[in-house]
Amino acid sequence: MLKYFISIITFLFVNITIGNVKTANDTLEKFGVRAGLDLNKIIRSATDEDYSGSSLSGDIRLKESFYVFTEIGNEEKVINSNYLNSSVEGTFVKFGVNFKLNKDIRTQNIVYSGLSAGYSNFDQNINSYTIYNTHSIYWGESIINSPINLSNLNAIWIEFMFGMKTEILNNLFLGFELQLKNVIKQKNIQNITNFYIPGFNRTYDSSGLGAGFSYTVSYLIPVVKK
């Protein structure tokens, strides 16, 4: 899997480098709406029986190096561990801005960084869990199979992104993005941890930090050419 990711990143860098050596006469600046799919979620849904998800994204280039974007999606995730079995399903939405970092403003290939805010509404079911009796050397642990249903949960977080998009065909782009996330607010019921937040990823008790990545395919619908 790591080798596959490295190959994708290398491919994108090579294409961006080639695109950046074009002269101003080789291409026109295109301003329009770019719509895309997260291929990572599609592949995970096909290969991981404990996961299902999809998302649609879109961005608009407002200035030479400034983009606004949004993403909407849904995820279902089953978490299995030695002490817990839980399932989560819900929807999410993100809004943010991206700033183009590469110097040649005319090339459609971009390296960018950005900042976004995310919101998710979801339900969580605790199907079974293990408790430990620290006061008894005879009973040790007990598995509880009484489900706990937690509905209408939500969370808000921020993301810092770094990524790249390269034009592989006319107006068709392949992209890769890394994300560093931090939960700033979330709703808990009965003081039970939200073990997975759709759109955010896995959570941990000790920190609100998280990480993620995506690789996307998108199509640019030009509105203005300069």
What feature does the model see in each segment?
Residues 16-61, 71, 218-226:
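Short glycine/proline- and aromatic-enriched beta-strand/turn motifs that initiate or cap beta-hairpins
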Residues 21-31, 65, 102-110, 168-174, ...:
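Short loop/turn motifs that connect adjacent beta-strands in outer-membrane beta-barrel proteins
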Residues 31, 50-54, 87-93, 109, ...:
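Residues that define the transmembrane beta-barrel architecture of outer-membrane proteins
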Residues 33-37, 68-70, 93, 109-115, ...:
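Transmembrane beta-strands of outer-membrane beta-barrel proteins
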Residues 39-43, 72-78, 99-101, 117-123, ...:
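Transmembrane beta-strands of outer-membrane beta-barrel pores
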Residues 45, 73, 77-88, 122-133, ...:
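Extracellular/periplasm-exposed beta-strand and loop segments of Gram-negative cell-envelope proteins
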Residues 46-101, 118-120:
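Glycine- and aromatic-enriched membrane insertion/assembly motifs of diderm outer-membrane
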Residues 98, 207-226:
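Outer-membrane beta-barrel "beta-signal"
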